[in-house]
Amino acid sequence: MKRGILVALALLFAASGCGYRLESGTARFTDPSVRIDVSPFANRSTTPDAGAVVAARLREELRRSGFRGTFGNIGPNYLVEGRVREVRSDVFSHGADRFSLENRLTLVVDIRVVEVVRGGVLWKESGLSETASFFSGADAQYTEANRRAAFEEIARRMAVRLSQTLRVLL
């Protein structure tokens, strides 16, 4: 029994001496020389700044999740192109007065990530969506403030999803 353990330990030490080691697959993600161009996303929705907000949240989330490279459109290694296809609001529940009480805001995004040097598409996805609820009332400012907060939340959630995928890709 002891002999089997000693043989197993000897094999482990021999394998570690050969130069093999476990390493994270995200070495490029943390490489400070990597440049990513995350331009404002094209906006096909009725929300005026939707494309710019989603791209800004994506840059923030990439930094937060450990990206150490730089952002810029001069000499990038990777190009992130996106399009906000729609931001729609649907009535989710009605109050006693038959007016909407709770609404559901949905963000739909298309994204494409290109490796500039090789010219290949690393990732392309259409119809990614995130949803958040918000309350509405008789006061238009109250409703619009809640709608904006819901939009900021779904933009943040979308950025987290995109950032997690980019972390795996890079």
Task: Specify the residue positions occupied by each region the protein language model found.
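A structural "domain/chain start" motif
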Residues: 16-59, 63-67, 71, 140, ...
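Conserved acidic
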Residues: 46, 50, 101, 146, ...
